[in-house]
Each structure stands twice: as C-alpha cells, then as structure tokens.
UniProtKB/Swiss-Prot annotation:
Taxonomic lineage of the native organism: Eukaryota, Metazoa, Chordata, Craniata, Vertebrata
Record organism: Rattus norvegicus
Compartment list: Cell membrane; Basolateral cell membrane; Cell junction, Tight junction
Any one of the GO CC terms: basolateral plasma membrane
Family, as annotated: Belongs to the claudin family.
Name assigned to this protein: Claudin-7
Amino acid sequence: MANSGLQLLGFSMAMLGWVGLIASTAIPQWQMSSYAGDNIITAQAMYKGLWMECVTQSTGMMSCKMYDSVLALPAATQATRALMIVSLVLGFLAMFVATMGMKCTRCGGDDKVKKARIAMTGGIIFIVAGLAALVACSWIGHQIVTDFYNPLTPMNIKYEFGPAIFIGWAGSALVLLGGALLSCSCPGSESKAAYRAPRSYPKSNSSKEYV
C-alpha cells in the first residue's frame, strides 16, 4: 500500500502541472516571430496563440486580436485547442477523484483498499490528461518546425517556439509524473480480508475402549 507522503507528492506535482497547463493554454506566446533572417524588422515581435495573435512594439506596448474564425485556423491549432481543453477537464476531474482516495483525507470512507483504488483511478486520469497535453504541444511544435524549414515559407512569416509550448511540456511532464505516483496506490494482489489460520479439529478416537 502506498504511503500518504507519496500520494501527497504525486498530487502536488500533478496539480502544479495542471496549473501550468492552464497558463500555457491562456497565454498567446505559442509561436513567436523568428529573427533568423537578415531583413527581419526587430522593432516589433509577433506572437500566435490558441485564441489570439499579438504584436509587441519595441516600446513594450502589446496589442492583441482574437481570431475571427475557428474554421480558418490551421488544423494543428484546432487540434491543439481541443486537446488542451480535454486535458484541463480531465485534470480537474482527476483532482476531484484523487482527493477522495488519498489517505490524508476522510473522503471515500474508511476502507483503505477502496481509497487506494480511488487514488489509483485519479492517477490514471492524470496520466491521460498529461498525455493529451503532451500530444497537443508536440503536434503544434512539429508544425512550427515543419513550416520553419519549409523553403516555400517566406522568411518574414516564419515562427519559432514560444514560451507557452515549453510551459505546456513542463506541465505535461509534472502531470504525468504526479499521476504515475498516484497510480502506485494500487493495492495489487493484496486481499481485503485478513489471513485466516486453518481451523484445527480434534482427532476422533475411534479405538476408544469400552468397559
């Protein structure tokens, strides 16, 4: 049976990673303009996120614009949107389930085996959430690399990895590790019932002498 310290560590890591995924989904710095060419204007920096695109001037002023049409977005951006939302929803559900199964809480009854299985279920949901976010960040990251090295892409519209992708990768790793630690709460092959010693019966004395 996993100890409560391991469960608390796993839950804390997963929750911290989930908060990172929220920040990654919200901020617009998924793609940032590249400065790889000689004719790149550095007076402004352009960013693309899941919900908006922004331009930052050299003075520090930032102006953002929401995307006009969802259908006009690239497939990678649409898929990343969906996967990140799924990851956040699953992460919230996993926190609720894991809280009921942790040893340091009184939710879920006093049955230790049952609570361990609930915590393990929460850990598995965390793992699924982390995988969804990892796929989302890797998908759009692959698209950025493909477009960057595509010779047909003009130099002035090439983008590089933004901070949001790295935050998403870090958050995914924390959620996966936290979910794995919570999954160690599995009771395994231990039986709920305690071991019962075999009963001993008195030997019958069939050769008892009769007077």
